């Protein structure tokens, strides 16, 4: 579900099977949708995710408290990416502090290690989606072989990458594309992509398509 303010609650031991997996969404608001676009309705979220129980964020507190009282351990998500640069308190951390304040006698643990283990093993469906992303990337590379020539600008190459990704229904680049010609290829994470490619120069490219969240 690629939508802001979305939350997933997993409680495998909940006596009520209906609430063992819950998807929390912001309630659609027709006025806001005129400005920001449509948000998922409950039935749409179920179709996309397979999760049957959809609740709105504005009623989460009433649902969460009885669930918390049935649990001993609470696993919370935080950003444990070693490359993260944002030192400000983000929403996940604020939510964690709020939970600890409201339910101080529970045991709090990190969900990141569990998520890493889950990500390490892909289902056949996930592998198929990843392969689609790889195929789009390969197709884009072959397009660039015909496009790149002396005098072309790095950002023009990047534009071709975007074009091919979008034409193949990719969500866009999986990460910031590197198009580094000449001496700039020695910069490990060159992302300016704003120089002209000269005759005889090597062009280093690092790019990949995102497809289906992969």
Q: How would you name each of these model-derived features?
A:
Residues 1-139:
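A composition/biophysics-driven feature that prefers long, compositionally simple stretches
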Residues 68, 121, 148-149, 197:
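Hydrophobic beta-strand core residues of beta-sandwich domains
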Residues 32-54, 143-145, 167-179, 208-211:
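Short flexible/disordered coil segments
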Residues 122-169, 175:
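Active-site pocket-lining segments that scaffold enzyme catalytic pockets across diverse folds
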